[in-house]
Amino acid sequence: MFVLSERCKALRGDAVNEKNFAAKICAQHAFWSKWGKVTLDPSKYSNITLNAAGTASVMRNAAPVIADGELIVGYNFGDGAHSGLTGDRGRDTEIFRRNGFTDDQIAWYYNPDNQVKGYTRLPPTENLTEKEHQLRAELTAINSAGNSSITANHSVIGYEKVLRLGFSGLLEEVNRYAVINGESDYYTALRMICEAGCVLGENYAAEAQLIGRNDIAEVCRQVPAYGARSFREAVQSLWFAHIVNTWEDDINANSLGRLDQILYPYYRHDIDSGVLTDEDACELLCCLWIKLYRDYDVQQSCVGGRAPDGSSQVNDLSYLMLDVTEALNFVRCLSVRFDSSTDKAFLRRALEVVGRVRKGIPFFFNDDVMIPALTAVGIPYEDACGYTQIGCVETVIPGKSNPHAVNSRSNLLKAVEYALADGYSMFDPKLRPGAETGNPLTFESFDMLMEAIKAQIKHIIRATANVAVSFMPNSEVNDPKPVKSLLTEGCTERGIDFN
């Protein structure tokens, strides 16, 4: 059982009591993202370079803020790129000033000539059936939000590549594949991210030096520009990579993956070398957990699981992450993977955390069910064994997929309505968006009603999938993701975007 250090108690108190950096950071993303996009060289202009220029500008220019007592530095911007701004120019002008922006910079931001000029390809509709059009028209059977193409956030990308190579190593990889595949806006965009990633740590190192935090300065001179050499550098590099990902398209369910597997080699090296204790490791993990809590938006992570050879992947970090979750005693998304052969001591410890924290965490995933379910839909066995969770526990293969986890939504209660109305809408009787399952007055048993409901469910799900697929060809044009592309297997190698 880990006992919180005085440092962690203070940082936890600041986070729980919402003492944050809002006065210093809330306008940083809004200004610097716009600056990067508006000042982009027109000769390099496309949607993917536009998005990269905005994110890279934030990486290069956002103020490096270091709180008292922090071991891990860097910050998210709340839920939304403009979190903290009010929409009222007078009030927001004061916010910009508190963020250190000059009156000339504020005037530039509000100048109507300084607009971001992207372009949008409208989604096609000709491939949808009449019933699918009607289902969408209701907005209650498919995607109540009225947007059938949610292509932002909800990811687990290959953070371990940043830990291993640093952004300088990733830049070398981008340059190598640009030669193989030919130069394009895609590789220009990825270079922008890599080059800015090499600056990000230096900015924090310089700030740390100014305030006498030489320990932070030493770490940030190494990461994220170069590969991590220690557990502390690995945690810091992971956090930098994660906030860059959230700076691309907000926090919402952008998640971290199997942290006990990603960080374990660095932990093991430092423990074996005698330069790290479990107490040190827990304190660093506490700092990471607090960072994730401060701007909480279901940033999921996972411990445990089964390797392809059938062996358990539970390790010492799996236990330490449970210890930290219990000690901090706040809602911090964490999942536990297990199977029939998992050490009962590990399961007991996870269940103790559930009972003591009493906030519904951790979540549990049974590999004996999940892995066969993934292979059954064509995912290779080794990849299936590496599955993890996004946000509200959607399943993903980390660093190897774009799951479109919340791309369209189905209202399955409509299946009951349609079954009771032979496919007609009760909101608009002229519409018949449901399947034709027969007049319910002819149903002679409850089983017949259930069969009709099941048929309507299949109809709604199939239509939802068709609508989502019809939008997907537009995602690359409308919403390219250079950061996620950089850290997703197959994208850089083939010159294709994450979306």
Please name every model-derived segment.
Residues L190-I193, G197:
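Amphipathic alpha-helix face/heptad-repeat signature
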Residues M1-L190, L210-N499:
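Conserved catalytic cores of very large enzyme subunits
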